[in-house]
Amino acid sequence: MSTEEQKEEIKDISSKQENSSEVPKAEEAGKVVESQKDTTSEEKKEETTEKKEDDGKKDLSFDEAEVLKQVEFYFSDTNLPHDKFLWTTSQKNDGWVPIQTIANFKRMRRFQPLEAIVNALRKSPELLEVDEAGEKVRRMIPLVRVDNKSVMERSVYCKGFGDEKDDTQIALEKFFEENAGPISAVRMRRDDDKKFKGSVFVEFKEPDVANKFLEKVKTAPLKWGEDELTIMSKKEYVDMKAELHKNDPPKFSSKRRRFDAFKEMDRQRPGKYSNRGRKFKKQRSSNASEEKPSAASE
């Protein structure tokens, strides 16, 4: 073998040794990269878990005043007579309703824990009472039949709220409390398919609050976002709609009649409807005998 050939062979051997030594280096480098990826992945998972836990803590907010306000609304003269589920539940047990049942209501789920809700309800000045075990709540004051005329005088119609969002009801209540004053209820108006119409009836606690609000918006119109609201008294709205549709043919709505606890109590009152029913049947029987055609005329 010539000297040149020997040099070439030595060079090839050296090159192969270098390449073979680079393979484990590359493999080692790959392992390091994979290890870094795994570490980064684990860190991201931990961050995501922590974020979810933080988000969960944020959702489980608690405000005693807000809890008490919401539950007192459920048992108020404005709501209870028309809340069929709550009324029926309360009538099964001398007015008592399980606090856990109320805690499961959509507006109440964000308030935790249950013990804190119980403590908040115990601070009701006069409307509510909690049993000794802290398991049930009921209304202490007798239910008052609200005069429809009084409700009309305290109510306002507002339109221009756009599409409904998850927090629209809460946002509307805060909006009117901040811009007008104490409210009894904000009723979101819906069509036959239960879609929000973008308008509401606001029932204030006092007629003066409603009147001052109507005077205020005459010179300082209110906006919801970028849209100016249409605002008038409920009576004005009802009269306007009646005039607009006075010549229309009768319209039959698929909506169910609103539940009325007072009518239910009237039905259960002994003698109130039973006597009336007997008189009605007797009168119908008498009229039927008078109007029944004779055999000859048939």
UniProtKB/Swiss-Prot annotation:
InterPro entries linked: La_dom_prot, La_HTH, Lupus_La, Nucleotide-bd_a/b_plait_sf, RBD_domain_sf, RRM_dom, WH-like_DNA-bd_sf, WH_DNA-bd_sf
GO biological process: one example: tRNA 5'-leader removal
Domain of life: Eukaryota
GO molecular function: mRNA binding; RNA folding chaperone; tRNA binding
The entry's keywords: Nucleus, Phosphoprotein, RNA-binding
Domain called RRM: residue spans: 154-236
Predominant localisation class: nucleus
GO CC annotations on file: cytoplasm; nucleus; ribonucleoprotein complex
The HTH La-type RNA-binding domain, residue ranges: 57-148
SMART domains for this protein: LA, RRM
Listed Basic and acidic residues bias regions: 1-15, 24-60, 259-269, 289-298
Basic residues composition-biased segments: 275-284
Positions of modified residues (Phosphoserine): S61, S124
Matches recorded under PROSITE patterns: HTH_LA (PS50961), RRM (PS50102)
Annotated localization: Nucleus
Gene3D superfamilies listed in its UniProt record: 3.30.70.330, Winged helix-like DNA-binding domain superfamily/Winged helix DNA-binding domain
Region (Disordered): 1-60, 242-298
Biological role stated in the UniProt entry: RNA chaperone that binds to tRNA precursors and promotes their folding and maturation. Also able to bind misfolded tRNAs. Acts as a regulator of tRNA methylation: binding to nascent pre-tRNAs inhibits the activity of tRNA (guanine(26)-N(2))-dimethyltransferase trm1.
Name by which UniProt lists this protein: La protein homolog
Native species: Schizosaccharomyces pombe (strain 972 / ATCC 24843)
